[in-house]
């Protein structure tokens, strides 16, 4: 292996890796925003393999047929991010004229196949690429879960292997001639999956991120980090939704607070940080049941307070997407 192809050993670095470092083994080593002013920048720049990733033009061409690309993020696990992703996909796909795709990038904990009623399905490969599994005529789904020999198999991968799968999903999945919305479910926090998807999709453009939280401060602490990640990665924050905001009794329809907003909840956080607050969604046990059964919650309980709240959030999100397009047109 020639010197120009040698990966940098951490022992060669002049100083510890700073926060938000892309990693000395990354293609962005020495070139990222976090590299500016770093004592290691010259070392990383001189020894990293140069030249653009040959797969990037292929990814860009594949994704150029998709009108809107939305990332669904959460700072902490267990706040209902994947559940809300499934609700978002069902809600947009309710309009039969709109083609929707859902991509499950929560590689170590894929749950969208169960929630969308596609568990046990498999992916078919053709000359045009991988075909997503369609849970409705206008709603396709792609997940690593479809490739596992056993649904209970643990996925124990390091960053490089996760990165390779994400690249393959973006490069090889054939969503058809036209896709109106691609909703991407990501793992909680800021990890390899987030860095990979933002890097590969940067050229073709991401409409923005939807952040899901619950009202209590312990969840909001990590949301602040997620917002910081989006700003440093130049991802527009389309808005924040506060999930499990109150509990709706399925019998009396009364609402009570389960997770109290001790510091003002998501709405106050949005006011402090200047991001759109898209709304609050009450906790309804029937949502969990619908997800377990792989059924559309809106079909079963169209008049429930939770269904109304979710649809209001989806409308507000789509307004933000359109607003972003208008701002781009003005520029």
Curated annotation (Swiss-Prot):
Q: Where is this region: Disordered?
A: 1-32
MF (Gene Ontology): 4 iron, 4 sulfur cluster binding; ATP binding; ATP-dependent FeS chaperone activity; iron-sulfur cluster binding; metal ion binding
Residues annotated as binding ATP: 75-82
Q: Report the superkingdom from the record.
A: Eukaryota
- Cofactors (names): [4Fe-4S] cluster
List the GO terms this entry assigns under cellular component, sorted alphabetically.
Answer: cytosol; nucleus
> Hydrolase: present as a keyword of the record?
no
Task: Show the Pfam families listed in the entry.
Answer: ParA
Provide the cofactor note recorded for this chain's UniProt entry.
Binds 4 [4Fe-4S] clusters per heterotetramer. Contains two stable clusters in the N-termini of NBP35 and two labile, bridging clusters between subunits of the NBP35-CFD1 heterotetramer.
- Assembly behavior: Heterotetramer of 2 NBP35 and 2 CFD1 chains.
Q: What is this protein called?
A: Cytosolic Fe-S cluster assembly factor NBP35
Say which species the protein is native to: Candida albicans (strain SC5314 / ATCC MYA-2876) (Yeast)
Q: Which gene encodes it?
A: NBP35
């Amino acid at each position: 292996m020639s010197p120009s192809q040698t990966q940098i050993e951490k022992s060669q670095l002049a100083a510890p890796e700073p926060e938000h470092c892309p990693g000395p083994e990354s293609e962005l080593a020495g070139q990222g925003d976090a590299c500016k002013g770093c004592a290691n920048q010259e070392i990383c720049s001189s020894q990293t393999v140069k030249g653009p990733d040959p797969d990037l033009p292929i990814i860009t061409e594949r994704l150029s047929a998709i009108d809107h690309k939305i990332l669904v993020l959460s700072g902490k696990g267990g706040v209902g991010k994947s559940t809300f992703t499934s609700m978002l996909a069902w809600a947009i796909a309710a309009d039969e004229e709109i083609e929707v795709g859902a991509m499950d990038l929560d590689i170590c904990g894929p749950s969208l196949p169960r929630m969308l009623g596609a568990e046990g399905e498999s992916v078919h490969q053709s000359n045009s690429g991988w075909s997503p599994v369609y849970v409705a005529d206008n709603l396709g789904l792609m997940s690593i879960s479809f490739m596992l020999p056993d649904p209970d198999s643990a996925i124990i991968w390091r960053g490089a292997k996760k990165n390779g799968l994400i690249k393959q999903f973006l490069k090889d999945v054939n969503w058809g001639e036209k896709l109106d919305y691609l909703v991407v479910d990501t793992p909680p926090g800021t990890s390899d999956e987030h860095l990979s998807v933002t890097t590969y999709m940067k050229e073709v453009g991401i409409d923005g991120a939807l952040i899901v939280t619950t009202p209590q401060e312990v969840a909001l602490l990590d949301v602040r980090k997620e917002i910081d990640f989006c700003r440093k990665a130049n991802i527009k924050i389309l808005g924040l939704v506060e999930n499990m905001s109150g509990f709706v009794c399925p019998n009396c329809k009364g609402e009570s607070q389960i997770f109290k907003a001790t510091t003002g909840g998501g709405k106050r956080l949005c006011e402090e940080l200047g991001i759109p607050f898209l709304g609050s969604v009450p906790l309804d046990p029937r949502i969990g049941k619908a997800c377990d059964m792989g059924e559309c919650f809106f079909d079963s309980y169209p008049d429930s307070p939770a269904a109304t709240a979710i649809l209001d959030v989806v409308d507000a999100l789509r307004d933000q997407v359109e607003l972003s397009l208008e701002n781009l047109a003005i520029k």
